């Protein structure tokens, strides 16, 4: 079991999205701590994000990476792009992503780009609307990817075959 876990950790790409210094005001002054937002993925449809907080930056990053590994979800991709246009929302952030042709690259900003890179998406057009808070953008992006349906899933739900769905 330990070998399997060690092997699993090695295949995952890790990306640090944001580190932030936060403070707590107490009677004697301020207490500073750090937060870190990270994403991990295998480059083949598995992604997870984590948010860690600690007194020191390395400890916050370590906590965030552990949380990201614990909360991995699987996304079905279509040859390095998406199956269809999708929207995702979390609090004040709205993200829109649509499939792109081969060679387009990842057209996305900041936090959304990091999530798409570790997920294994190579060609996508995207736009973030509303709040650009990195935590909300990451959650909205993961939400959009998780709710994306493949043609085989849609066909199974409708009781048809994939060729009838594609037209």
UniProtKB/Swiss-Prot annotation:
<dbReference type="InterPro" id="IPR000851">
    <property type="entry name" value="Ribosomal_uS5"/>
</dbReference>
<keyword id="KW-0694">RNA-binding</keyword>
<keyword id="KW-0687">Ribonucleoprotein</keyword>
<dbReference type="GO" id="GO:0015935">
    <property type="term" value="C:small ribosomal subunit"/>
</dbReference>
<protein>
    <recommendedName>
        <fullName>Small ribosomal subunit protein uS5</fullName>
    </recommendedName>
</protein>
<dbReference type="InterPro" id="IPR013810">
    <property type="entry name" value="Ribosomal_uS5_N"/>
</dbReference>
<dbReference type="GO" id="GO:0003735">
    <property type="term" value="F:structural constituent of ribosome"/>
</dbReference>
<feature type="domain" description="S5 DRBM">
    <location>
        <begin position="12"/>
        <end position="75"/>
    </location>
</feature>
<dbReference type="Pfam" id="PF03719">
    <property type="entry name" value="Ribosomal_S5_C"/>
</dbReference>
<comment type="function">
    <text>With S4 and S12 plays an important role in translational accuracy.</text>
</comment>
<dbReference type="InterPro" id="IPR020568">
    <property type="entry name" value="Ribosomal_Su5_D2-typ_SF"/>
</dbReference>
<comment type="subunit">
    <text>Part of the 30S ribosomal subunit. Contacts proteins S4 and S8.</text>
</comment>
<dbReference type="InterPro" id="IPR018192">
    <property type="entry name" value="Ribosomal_uS5_N_CS"/>
</dbReference>
<dbReference type="InterPro" id="IPR005324">
    <property type="entry name" value="Ribosomal_uS5_C"/>
</dbReference>
<keyword id="KW-0689">Ribosomal protein</keyword>
<comment type="similarity">
    <text>Belongs to the universal ribosomal protein uS5 family.</text>
</comment>
<dbReference type="InterPro" id="IPR005712">
    <property type="entry name" value="Ribosomal_uS5_bac-type"/>
</dbReference>
<dbReference type="Pfam" id="PF00333">
    <property type="entry name" value="Ribosomal_S5"/>
</dbReference>
<dbReference type="GO" id="GO:0019843">
    <property type="term" value="F:rRNA binding"/>
</dbReference>
<comment type="function">
    <text>Located at the back of the 30S subunit body where it stabilizes the conformation of the head with respect to the body.</text>
</comment>
<dbReference type="InterPro" id="IPR014721">
    <property type="entry name" value="Ribsml_uS5_D2-typ_fold_subgr"/>
</dbReference>
<dbReference type="GO" id="GO:0006412">
    <property type="term" value="P:translation"/>
</dbReference>
<keyword id="KW-0699">rRNA-binding</keyword>
């Amino acid at each position: 079991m330990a070998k399997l876990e060690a092997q699993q950790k090695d295949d995952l790409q890790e990306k640090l999205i944001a580190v932030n210094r936060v403070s707590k005001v107490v009677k004697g002054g301020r207490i500073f701590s750090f937060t870190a937002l990270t994403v991990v993925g295998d480059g083949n449809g598995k992604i997870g994000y984590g948010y860690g907080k600690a007194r020191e930056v390395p400890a916050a990053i370590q906590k965030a990476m552990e949380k990201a590994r614990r909360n991995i979800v699987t996304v079905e991709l279509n040859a390095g792009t998406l199956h269809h246009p999708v929207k995702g929302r979390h609090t004040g952030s709205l993200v829109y992503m649509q499939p792109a042709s081969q060679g387009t690259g990842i057209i996305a900003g900041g936090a959304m780009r990091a999530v798409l890179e570790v997920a294994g998406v190579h060609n996508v057009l995207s736009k973030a609307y509303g709040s650009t808070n990195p935590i909300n953008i990451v959650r909205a992006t993961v939400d959009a990817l998780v709710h994306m349906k493949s043609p085989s899933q849609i066909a199974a739900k409708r009781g048809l075959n994939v060729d009838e769905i594609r037209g």
